[in-house]
Amino acid sequence: MSMSITQPIKDLLSSQFQSYNISEQVKLYDIFPLLKPSCIKEAITDVVEVCTGYGPESLDPSIRAKAAVKLSLCEFEAVGLSIIPQGCYSNSIEEMMDCMLEIEHSSHWWTTYSGNYQRLSDVCSTYREYYQEKAIIETFLNITDFMADFHNQFKSSVVSETQEFQSNMKDKFAGVYNQFTHFESLLSQMIQKHSGIINDSIVAIKNKLSTEFVDELQMLKNDRYILINQILESDTEIKKTIDSMLVELTEDMKNQISAKSEFLINHMNITRLNESTALHDIIEENLQERFKDIAIFLDKFMVEIQTETNKVLLEVNEKLPTLEQQYLGNFAQALSNIDKQVLSASLQWQYDYDVVFANLYAALDLLNSNLNSSVKKIEQIEHVIDTIIVDTSFLNDQLANLILIPSTILRAFSFIGVKRVIIAIIVLYFKSTLLCLVHYGQSFRIAALLMSATAGIFCSKLLMSYIYN
């Protein structure tokens, strides 16, 4: 392709025109006018060869004179001058000198020669530029040929490399597809081989979880029953302790009254011996009245203490069953909710695992998503277990509140006077005894008895100080 474009131009530049027809030459001459053959071109051939290599300053005078003569002859031929010296057509130096002598005799000839001789410098510069352009054109044509060849080679190389790359990629993709198919087959075989083991493992896990849940619930129920029994035993023990305190307080008060009565009787006998009978009668009458008042007051005081104590015990006995039933009902409801959540979670977990292992045979890309779903369900079960733990702690708090209910009820009473103070002390003892029994169990009974004795002595002292004052 490139040779069909640039080769005629190269041949034309080297003056090889014989292999081309007239129309091609005319076409090329129209594109490059400087390539047209002429008399002037032939006359300055030697000058141009020197100029293109070294410039106008390097022209030899003989070459310059010879070229000026030839240019003059071209002008003479162009104007149709028939008388031209014959020596001017020769290339020898001697005949050329004869030509110049003949030209010198004619002013017209000499003027033409002199003008051509002087203009050779300009002609040399002009043709030097032309030949430089010619060299540039040749260089351009060479580069064009090189680029055309390079383009063709590059195109063929790219096509070949692309085809080879496509072929290699097809082979590689085919190998990857075969490996993937083989891997899928192995995975299916492995799933079929181990499906029984996996199902057995799932069943074992579900059974283990169910057993653990049942055991945990049973432990919670046992703890609940033990705590309720402890509360009931503590209630009974408190009642017995209060009754014992009342009996001891009554006996102590009777003993104090008897001692005081004996002291008064002795004092009255001594007074009768030392004073007059009338005065003794008055004193005896006053003492008897005072003694009756004290006895009446003590009887009323004991009745009031017994009445207030019975009221407190009745209120406690009335409220405790209601609160126990309420909190036990809440506890049973919470346990029922826990059972339902555990059962629901177990059924849901079993269903999800069945779905996962059923979908494993569908496609390999669904395996990852199904496993993620299973992980989420396990997290839900863990959340349910956490909820069970929270509910258990809530039940413990409710039971602790149940223990503190008697103290809360009794604290609401506001008594005024010595009798109320004594009952308040009994209430405080009731509270401390109940709490200690809950926290320390049966080992606290001895300490409770010691506390009851201390409380009885303190109440007796308060009562005696009230009587004497």
Curated annotation (Swiss-Prot):
Localization annotation: Endoplasmic reticulum membrane; Nucleus membrane
Pfam families: Tht1 (PF04163)
GO cellular component: endoplasmic reticulum membrane; nuclear membrane
UniProt keyword list: Endoplasmic reticulum, Glycoprotein, Karyogamy, Membrane, Nucleus, Signal, Transmembrane, Transmembrane helix
Lumenal side: 467-469
Topological domains annotated Cytoplasmic: 442-445
Lipid bilayer topology: Multi-pass membrane protein
Record: glycosylation sites: 21, 142, 199, 269, 274, 372
GO BP terms in the entry: karyogamy involved in conjugation with cellular fusion; nuclear membrane fusion involved in karyogamy
Membrane-crossing residue ranges in chain numbering: 421-441, 446-466
InterPro entries linked: Nuclear_fusion_Kar5
PANTHER family: NUCLEAR FUSION PROTEIN KAR5 (PTHR28012:SF1)
Role: Required for nuclear membrane fusion during karyogamy.
Family to which the UniProt record says this protein belongs: Belongs to the KAR5 family.
Protein name per the record: Nuclear fusion protein KAR5
Lineage of the species this protein comes from: Eukaryota, Fungi, Dikarya, Ascomycota, Saccharomycotina
Name of the gene this protein is made from: KAR5
